């Protein structure tokens, strides 16, 4: 039984799904997808549970969410192993994901009060109040790269605000979704408040097509995000939050410490085997001997990165990609770039057929035109050389995406210029592109999102504002508008 609907584990009526470890091929999880009827059943359960859940005090909802945080802490080792084995990432990185899930609870509680919550301003004849109300039934679509942390960033603030939820994990990480759902079950959520439906495209289409859905919160690829936006077009009554990918630029200016700059670049481009939406995809490097030295050092250090299994000791920096198919897609993208005129500096290699262990790739594209503006979701970095900083910014902005952007430079003036001219939701200075503060919004513009950033701002799209003018008594105003006569004299 792999679906959680209305407080019960049930067997899916859709196609059989088998999840294997992407490196070893070991079967980790299997079960049947939810069919359209079961998706509808989950929605009805969430709708029935909504009034009572929304009427609970914030404190009552907070207690259950904090109980979930405690369960994450006490089950950290087990959940870490599940995420690592299912995604292929090393144990150390999966552990940081579970820690981020735990920390998200306190952050979301604080954000609710700061970003939403209630406010009251006294007026001479009463008061002006601002309250926030939950939307109702929300669908949450989870991605595979952070199958615990990223959907958690939607689910927790949505529950705190009083919404009920239908959660569909990525079809590539059903085991992680199952494990997290079982912890929510132990936290004592009332039946129907949070429902789990497993499945791929058909399940997702059935979920997003539900008429009785009040909104959809999505993290994933731009292609899927565009499809969801099209599917929900003409329905302004539904909240839609899209956090999508990026073709992210990193600009390397003058650097005093080449190794520090190389470390930052590797952390930006290759962490999580390049499977973060904020990863650097395009590197813009200043022409000259210093740039040459940096590039040679980057290739040399990147060449030493050997992906390994989730439990290898010592731990590798990167593990496998989510699937062998995903790894092969990166290799194919590199081959296509080379065919277009790119100069390979470091060729990506599949270490073994039948696995997703892929070494990083670096290819120089200076002077090559007609390149597709697409995100390659893996450890492949394209390099361009530039002559002046204005040119670097123009090249960085030459994309339909707008998620993250970064600058390595000792000059504050150049960072200030980038802040004014960059088209990105995250702009970092001498910090990896993959770094973000939990107390800041997370999201992008253009093809990277629809201006509804998550993280600190998630509370904003999980509730709608209700403004009120209030007075505990009703009296006739001392001064009336022109043309109003409330005298006792009878007009004939």
UniProtKB/Swiss-Prot annotation:
Gene3D superfamilies in alphabetical order: Aldehyde Dehydrogenase, Chain A, domain 1 (3.40.605.10), Aldehyde Dehydrogenase, Chain A, domain 2 (3.40.309.10)
PROSITE patterns referenced in this protein's UniProt entry, alphabetically: ALDEHYDE_DEHYDR_CYS, ALDEHYDE_DEHYDR_GLU
InterPro entries per record: Ald_DH/histidinol_DH, Ald_DH_C, Ald_DH_CS_CYS, Ald_DH_CS_GLU, Ald_DH_N, Aldehyde_DH_dom, SuccinylGlu_semiald_DH_AstD
Binding residue positions for NAD(+): 220-225
Family according to the record: Belongs to the aldehyde dehydrogenase family. AstD subfamily.
Official protein name in the record: N-succinylglutamate 5-semialdehyde dehydrogenase
Protein's job: Catalyzes the NAD-dependent reduction of succinylglutamate semialdehyde into succinylglutamate.
Phylogenetic lineage: Bacteria, Pseudomonadati, Pseudomonadota, Gammaproteobacteria, Enterobacterales
GO molecular function, a single term: aldehyde dehydrogenase [NAD(P)+] activity
Catalysis performed (reactions): N-succinyl-L-glutamate 5-semialdehyde + NAD(+) + H2O = N-succinyl-L-glutamate + NADH + 2 H(+)
One GO biological process term: arginine catabolic process to succinate
EC number(s) recorded for this UniProt protein: 1.2.1.71
Metabolic or biological pathway: Amino-acid degradation; L-arginine degradation via AST pathway; L-glutamate and succinate from L-arginine: step 4/5
One Pfam entry name: Aldedh
Residues passing through the membrane, by range: none
Active site feature: 243, 277
Keyword terms, alphabetized: Arginine metabolism, NAD, Oxidoreductase
Encoding gene per record: astD
């Amino acid at each position: 039984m792999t679906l959680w609907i209305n407080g019960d584990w049930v067997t899916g009526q859709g196609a059989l799904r088998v999840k294997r470890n992407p490196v070893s091929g070991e079967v980790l999880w299997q079960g049947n997808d939810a069919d359209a009827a079961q998706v509808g059943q989950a929605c009805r359960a969430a709708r029935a549970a909504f009034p009572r859940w929304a009427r609970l005090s914030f404190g009552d909802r907070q207690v259950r969410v904090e109980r979930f945080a405690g369960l994450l802490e006490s089950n950290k080792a087990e959940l870490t192993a599940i995420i690592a084995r299912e995604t292929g990432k090393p144990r150390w990185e999966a552990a940081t994901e579970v820690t981020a899930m735990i920390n998200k609870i306190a952050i979301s509680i604080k954000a609710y009060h700061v970003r939403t919550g209630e406010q009251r301003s006294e007026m001479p004849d009463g008061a002006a109040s601002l309250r926030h109300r939950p939307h109702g039934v929300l669908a949450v679509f989870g991605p595979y790269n952070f199958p615990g942390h990223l959907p958690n960033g939607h689910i927790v603030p949505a529950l705190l605000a009083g919404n009920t939820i239908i959660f569909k994990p990525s079809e590539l990480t059903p085991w992680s979704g199952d494990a997290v759902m079982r912890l929510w079950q132990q936290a004592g959520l009332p039946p129907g408040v949070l429902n789990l439906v497993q499945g791929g495209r058909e399940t997702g289409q059935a979920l997003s097509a539900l008429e009785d859905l009040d909104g959809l919160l999505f993290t994933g690829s731009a292609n899927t995000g565009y499809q969801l936006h099209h599917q929900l077009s003409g329905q302004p009554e539904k909240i839609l939050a899209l956090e999508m990918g990026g073709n992210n630029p990193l600009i390397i200016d003058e650097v005093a410490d080449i190794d520090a700059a190389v470390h930052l670049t590797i952390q930006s481009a290759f962490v999580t085997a390049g499977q973060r939406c904020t990863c650097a995809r395009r590197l813009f490097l200043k022409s000259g001997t210093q740039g040459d030295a940096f590039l040679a050092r980057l290739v040399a250090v990147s060449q030493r990165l050997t992906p390994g299994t989730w439990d290898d000791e010592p731990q590798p920096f990167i593990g496998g990609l989510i699937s062998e198919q995903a790894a092969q897609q990166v290799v194919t993208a590199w081959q296509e770039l080379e065919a277009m005129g790119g100069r390979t500096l470091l060729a990506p290699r599949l270490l073994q057929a039948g696995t997703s262990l892929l070494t990083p790739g670096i290819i120089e594209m200076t002077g090559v035109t007609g390149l597709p503006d697409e995100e390659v979701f893996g450890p492949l970095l394209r390099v361009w050389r530039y002559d002046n900083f204005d040119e670097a910014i123009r090249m960085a902005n030459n994309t339909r995406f707008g998620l993250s952007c970064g600058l390595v430079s000792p000059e504050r003036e150049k960072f200030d210029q980038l802040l004014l001219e960059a088209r990105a939701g995250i702009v970092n200075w001498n910090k990896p592109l993959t770094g973000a503060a939990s107390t800041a919004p997370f999201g992008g513009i253009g093809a990277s999102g629809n201006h509804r950033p998550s993280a600190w701002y998630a509370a904003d799209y999980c509730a709608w504002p209700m403004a009120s003018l209030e007075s505990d008594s009703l009296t006739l105003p001392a001064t009336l508008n022109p043309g109003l006569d409330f005298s006792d004299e009878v007009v004939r």
